[in-house]
């Protein structure tokens, strides 16, 4: 089992904390976000971790020396692209996972989570497994006056996700919340690469051009083709760091 952390982002809403460091290096409760992630992954037994940097990638790479991260990729167009493009900057690492028959966990770099969450994801044996928070509203109520302003749809049937990432207009459209942590089996990863490379570069995906496609748009496209996205349900014990106010939010277990 391997993992990749997508850490190319600038984090403009966290300025001035991101003036001299990338978003993932901002501290939450006296520890950098990426430290929480690497520690959670390693404590769950994942030792081969790749990172994709972008904004101030040299600062990040130097910081990661203490973890002996061997696989560091750069999204040089971090300011013009989105998460899917960042992910495929590490295609060589994906191919390595396939060759060595290692499943791959994908993590956003602005979320704080712990070993128990990673372990649940590891335990899911499906081709595509996505962590979702059933208790999302507790966290969103702390973060926003109106949780629906930021929350996205997530609908499930028999434990499998059929829709995610759309603008939610009502609470009954949100059975859980996508957190930015998921896993591809090494067998399915071959399909994922082929699927990505066959996508039309000239159309919009949820009103975004190809290079700015949201990860949720890409996952939704995979769901519509393969219908294989297993929901790995958690109840809190994580948070997203997107705004200065998020740094004051207490994680509920």
From Swiss-Prot:
Catalytic activity line of the entry: N(5)-phospho-L-glutamine + CTP + H(+) = N(5)-(cytidine 5'-diphosphoramidyl)-L-glutamine + diphosphate
Domain of life of the native organism: Bacteria
Result of knocking out the encoding gene: Mutant does not express the MeOPN CPS modification.
Example GO BP: capsule polysaccharide biosynthetic process
Metabolic or biological pathway: Capsule biogenesis; capsule polysaccharide biosynthesis
Pfam families, per database record: NTP_transferase (PF00483)
Enzyme Commission number(s) of this protein: 2.7.7.103
Keyword terms, alphabetized: Capsule biogenesis/degradation, Nucleotidyltransferase, Transferase
Entry-linked Gene3D superfamilies: Spore Coat Polysaccharide Biosynthesis Protein SpsA, Chain A (3.90.550.10)
GO molecular function: cytidylyltransferase activity
Applied use: This enzyme is able to catalyze reactions that produce natural compounds CDP-ethanolamine, CDP-1-glycerol and CDP-2-glycerol, two of which are not available commercially. It can also produce CDP-serine, CDP-serinol and CDP-3-D-glycerate which may be potential inhibitors or mechanistic probes for enzymes that use CDP-glycerol. The labeled nucleotides, such as beta-[(18)O4]-CDP, generated with this enzyme can be used to probe the details of enzyme-catalyzed reactions using positional isotope exchange (PIX) and molecular isotope exchange (MIX) techniques.
Biological function: Involved in the biosynthesis of the O-methyl phosphoramidate (MeOPN) group found on the capsular polysaccharide (CPS) of C.jejuni. Catalyzes the formation of CDP-L-glutamine from CTP and L-glutamine phosphate. In the presence of MnCTP, catalyzes the displacement of pyrophosphate from CTP using phosphoramidate, methyl phosphate, methyl phosphonate, phosphate, arsenate, ethanolamine phosphate, (R/S)-glycerol-1-phosphate, glycerol-2-phosphate, serinol phosphate, L-serine phosphate and 3-phospho-D-glycerate as substrate in addition to L-glutamine phosphate.
Name assigned to this protein: CTP:phosphoglutamine cytidylyltransferase
Organism listed in the record: Campylobacter jejuni subsp. jejuni serotype O:2 (strain ATCC 700819 / NCTC 11168)
């Amino acid at each position: 089992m391997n993992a990749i952390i997508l850490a190319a982002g600038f984090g403009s809403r966290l300025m001035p904390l991101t003036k001299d460091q990338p978003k993932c290096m901002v501290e939450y409760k006296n520890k950098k976000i990426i430290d929480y992630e690497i520690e959670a992954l390693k404590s769950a037994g994942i030792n081969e971790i790749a990172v994709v940097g972008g904004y101030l990638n040299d600062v990040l790479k130097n910081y990661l020396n203490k973890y002996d991260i061997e696989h560091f990729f750069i999204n040089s167009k971090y300011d013009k692209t989105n998460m899917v493009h960042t992910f495929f900057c590490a295609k060589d690492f994906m191919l390595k996972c396939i060759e060595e028959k290692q499943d791959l966990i994908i993590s956003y770099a602005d979320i704080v989570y712990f070993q128990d969450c990673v372990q649940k994801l590891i335990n899911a044996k499906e081709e595509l497994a996505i962590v979702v928070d059933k208790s999302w509203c507790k966290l969103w109520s702390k973060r926003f006056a109106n949780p629906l302003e930021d929350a996205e749809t997530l609908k499930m049937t028999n434990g499998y996700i059929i829709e995610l990432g759309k603008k939610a207009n009502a609470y009954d459209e949100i059975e859980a919340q996508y957190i930015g942590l998921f896993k591809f089996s090494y067998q399915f990863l071959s399909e994922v690469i082929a699927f990505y490379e066959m996508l039309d570069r000239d159309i919009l995906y949820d009103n975004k051009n190809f290079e700015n496609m949201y990860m949720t748009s890409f996952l939704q496209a995979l769901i519509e083709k393969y219908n294989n996205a297993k929901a790995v349900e958690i109840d809190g014990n994580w948070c997203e760091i997107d705004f200065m106010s998020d740094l004051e939010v207490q994680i509920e277990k």
